[in-house]
């Protein structure tokens, strides 16, 4: 199940132009990954919203086609309209289409899992996952739609470091409230990540999430977009010693991102210039 942060207090805050029922409906939709089944009680636990509110909103979302009912379990899944929205966004951006061949090549080269994601509030949601061909290497078993914590992985830290200053300040405040006693340790990781990014252009993590998994990550902001995306290569820590991440893996991932950016610029349609009238 996707990691999710309870934010009922945020949904109840009065803000200019905020439509609360819409915000709550979107909060429910954000709990789902593709193919995942959730019941109303699970959605109550994930969102912190009242049971009656969840029931009313899910019923509406089913009628509109944004959710659908699984006939066997009677639980809910993403509907065709949600999946269609995602396809439309990615077609417009074109990033995944261009990035995937580069990600597959890097995954095969190092025998590691390569992922692409973007920040979703206090986590990073994976958009694309490329695994190595050998089943023996499947230690990092994440799927598209998985949410990863911001402050505990190279993926999350790179996303945070590459975010606009205003967004970064809001996210850091959210993390401070969310993490409580663990905030000081997280803040130190964030500060080290900033220093590392300035020095190397990428961020590494060793044995993150309490597992024997390490990773290296690089962020990018596509032309014409304010949304930072992050590319991440991860695998067993014994295959990713720090010396190798510094000498080979980090620079290779950084070069891959530069190649993707160059290809996106080349694929960008020419700007129409209106001739001046004489």
From Swiss-Prot:
Boundaries of every HTH iclR-type domain copy: 19-80
Keyword tRNA-binding: no
Induction data: Induced by p-toluenesulfonate (TSA), p-toluenecarboxylate (TCA) and p-sulfobenzoate (PSB).
UniProt domain IclR-ED: residue ranges: 95-266
Molecular function GO terms recorded: DNA binding; DNA-binding transcription factor activity
Highest taxon listed in the record's lineage: Bacteria
Function: Both copies function as additional regulators for the tsa locus, specifically for tsaT.
Protein name: HTH-type transcriptional regulator TsaQ1/TsaQ2
